[in-house]
Amino acid sequence: MPSYVIHLSCAKRALEMLPEMNAQEQNAFFLGNMIADMCRDKHYTHFWNNVTYDKLVRRPDLDWFLQKYGDALQEPYVRGYYAHLLLDYNFLDLYWDRHFRFYNAQKQPEVLYDAVTFVEVLELQQMYDRQEFFSKKWYYGDYDRMNAYFANRYNVMFPNLEFNAKEWERIRRITEIDWDYAPEAMERTKAQLSQSVAIAEPGIIPQLQIFVLPELEQLVEVTAKKVAEI
């Protein structure tokens, strides 16, 4: 899935396309956009249904989310949450499907989460061991390498938890979030982002190992436009 910074970048672009929101509404929109990742177990926060859960490519069930919360989709927090799920869905359909293929131990095509052993990056014509691929050296290392770039390029806003009682009532209507854990996770994530931005050289294009930066930027634009059109 995209990093939280890419999610916040997409949220920022969507916000620029939406009717103007006040500061509190913007904060709720950004919170909704990242809160699904601020949990230990993402099964239900990401609306992975039983069909997709046993697969490596776990697409959010957007219809499931809309059935539960579609009546509140115009609320900033709920729209921000939907934007997160939509970017995850598009990331798998428009990026992963174009660039990656997955194989089992016999190097036959594989879809099951527990059976995928190798990952092929098509444009590199390179096969990776799955554990090595999803590591700080390659896949997740690219996230670290580009977090500051996206944060600076899109001037992302990191949300806070300063809401009044009525606003909290709206936020807690999405019941999948573990609020005993999420605030601590947000603080850790905020500190990591601040550190990444502090040591980054402004304007430097990150040298990525796996990802194609212009395609990720295009994905942000395409998804933000769809969010704004809801």
Regions found by a protein language model. Give the residues of each.
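N-terminal leader/auxiliary helical segments
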Residues: 1-230
